[in-house]
From Swiss-Prot:
Residues 394-457 form the BTB domain. The gene is RCBTB2. This is RCC1 and BTB domain-containing protein 2. One of its GO terms (biological process) is cell population proliferation. It holds the Pfam family BTB. Keywords: Cytoplasmic vesicle, Repeat. It comes from Homo sapiens (Human).
Length: 551
């Protein structure tokens, strides 16, 4: 039965009825500010950001791409053209037709927003030119910022307390706003009224991600190096001292470590490496470094969460809270927690890091733009996904390791050449399978229904074997992508061997590069000691050609 739900539409911006068969909801109920919204309004939220000094400002988009705001509207941060507070959602008409790609906020607060087209809009507090429009007047409505960005596509934005940072698709970083500690990276301490490219050590680098603390900036380049600049009074730049840095400087203590992500709290920094390890440095008065004490650290310090690989880190410049998520789905938090100091990573009952900031952080803000894809009808692909392993509609079952997996002959024949021939004249409704394990074979069949895989990197090696055996090239590519996420120094040689065995060239090159980047440790592992002779010979030859053994 179809369900009737309200959709915002019309000149008034009030809900009108529309019929939807199903709808994915973004879970925002843990943030107190959303208690001001009706259940009907909450059902329509697709993206959301909570900000402000008390978590008292909200911007969200609906499933039909309208933007709404509510809150105290401090300094016009809601972009409505006035400074009137509102406890009811008001539509932000000035951004009508724009789709939000990413968004960040400052302490004033001010907002920096990038659209899916790569345009930048800013509004709100502007006493330090953090809006980048060349003035110090507060912006009551969104202003398109094009100076020095007119031919650029912005793909990521970040805000400090009163400065702004953006990253373009070609790996360039632009900054503007408050610069008393060098946080704009211009080499001076003069405020920057318009976007200016951050150069110096970044001049010939390709930046892949950025982050801002209250008064500092971080940039990760494509080689995995981290560059930092700005205020350093708490050691948040990780340079081993407390001196401010007016231009980008590489974090030398991370030499040989490839960083993938960076996140900044009020005055502390977290990074995530390609091996799933977290390092932290900076202020630690609330235990936000997770080191077991409250002593500041000016050098990167490992954070021990658990043996499982970390896949996500989270921090926000307006809080002293840290969070991380493991590959197994466990979420940990540490730092300031509702008036308490948690000095070691603490396992929560949450399934996402966003909930840590809703429930434990002060203020209760979002550390990133929350987002969920709209789902206003069931596609053919979604219908097929629902029917996988459904005994009610299946006409075939596989017996693997004593367990049944239910499937549909016609779909298997459509999706897989192997089944097209093997099931052609087969009238049996049970197929016994002993060549592969239950998790691997179930993942294979599920892939035929969903075009995706959900296995751990370790199990994906077995699926890679199956994909090679059945000549499923797309599945083979997906397996390689999954396996890459689980590589570490201890298993790198084993994964390299598997890549060679199953002729997975992309994975082979990835594993080889990983081994070269971590050569000293990899060559001391048991996997390297037990390496096949021919593989070892080829590895040494190839490593020599890329200069791995040069002094």
């Amino acid at each position: 039965m179809e369900e009737e739900l309200p959709l915002f539409s019309g000149d008034s911006g009030k809900p009108v009825q529309a019929t939807l068969s199903s709808l994915k909801m973004l879970d925002v109920g843990k943030w107190p500010i959303f208690s001001l919204c009706s259940e009907e309004e909450l059902q329509l939220i697709r993206q959301a950001c909570v900000f402000g000094s008390a978590g008292n400002e909200v911007l969200y988009t609906t499933v039909n791409d309208e933007i709404f705001v509510l809150g105290t509207n401090c300094c016009g941060c809601l972009g409505l053209g006035d400074v009137q507070s509102t406890i009811e959602p008001r539509r932000l008409d000035s951004l009508n037709g724009k789709k939000i790609a990413c968004l960040s906020y400052g302490s004033g607060p001010h907002i920096v927003l990038a659209t899916t087209e790569g345009e930048v809009f800013t509004w709100g507090h502007n006493a330090y030119s953090q809006l980048g429009n060349g003035t110090t007047n507060h912006g009551l409505v969104p202003c398109h910022i094009s100076t020095n960005l007119s031919n650029k596509q912005v793909i990521e934005v970040a805000c400090g307390s009163y400065h702004s940072l953006v990253l373009t698709s070609d790996g360039e970083v632009f900054a503007w706003g408050y610069n008393n500690s060098g946080q704009v990276g211009s080499g001076s301490t003069v405020n920057q009224p318009i976007p200016r490219r951050v150069t110096g050590c970044l001049q010939n680098k390709v930046v892949v991600t950025i982050a801002c603390g209250q008064m500092c900036c971080m940039a990760v380049v494509d080689t995995g190096e981290v560059y930092v600049w700005g205020y350093n009074g708490n050691g948040q730049l990780g340079l081993g001292n407390s001196g401010n840095q007016p231009t980008p400087c590489r974090v030398a203590a991370l030499q040989g470590i490839r960083v993938q992500r960076v996140a900044c709290g009020y005055a502390h920094t977290l990074v995530l490496t390609d091996e799933g390890q977290v390092y932290a440095w900076g202020a630690n008065s609330y235990g936000q470094l997770g080191t077991g004490n409250k002593s500041n650290q000016s050098y990167p310090t490992p954070v021990t969460v658990e043996k499982d690989r970390i896949i996500e880190i989270a921090a926000c410049h307006s809080t002293h809270t840290s969070a991380a998520k493991t590959q197994g789905g466990h979420v940990y938090m540490w730092g300031q927690c509702r008036g308490q100091s948690v000095i070691l990573p603490h396992l929560t009952h949450f399934s996402c890091t966003d909930d840590v900031f809703a429930c434990f952080a002060t203020p209760a803000v979002t550390w990133r733009l929350l987002s969920v894809e709209p789902d206003d009808h069931l596609t053919v692909a979604e219908s097929l996904k629902r029917e996988f392993d459904n005994p009610d509609t299946a006409d075939l079952k596989f017996l693997v390791d004593g367990k049944y997996i239910y499937a549909h002959k016609v779909l298997l024949k459509i999706r897989c050449e192997h089944f097209r021939s093997s099931l052609e004249d087969n009238e049996d409704d049970i197929v016994e399978m002993s060549e592969f394990s239950y998790p691997v074979y179930r993942a294979f069949l599920e892939y035929l229904y969903t075009d995706s895989i959900s296995l751990s990197p370790e199990e994906a090696v077995g699926l890679l074997d199956l994909a090679t055996f059945y000549r499923e090239n797309r599945l083979k590519k997906l397996c390689q992508q999954t396996i890459k996420q689980g590589i570490c120094e201890e298993n790198a040689i084993a994964l390299l061997s598997a890549a060679v065995k199953y002729d997975a060239q992309d994975l082979e090159e990835f594993c080889f590069r990983f081994c070269i980047n971590h050569l000293t440790v990899v060559t001391q592992t048991s996997g390297f000691a037990e390496m096949d002779h021919d593989l070892l010979k080829n590895f040494i030859s190839k490593a020599s050609r890329v200069g791995a053994f040069k002094n």
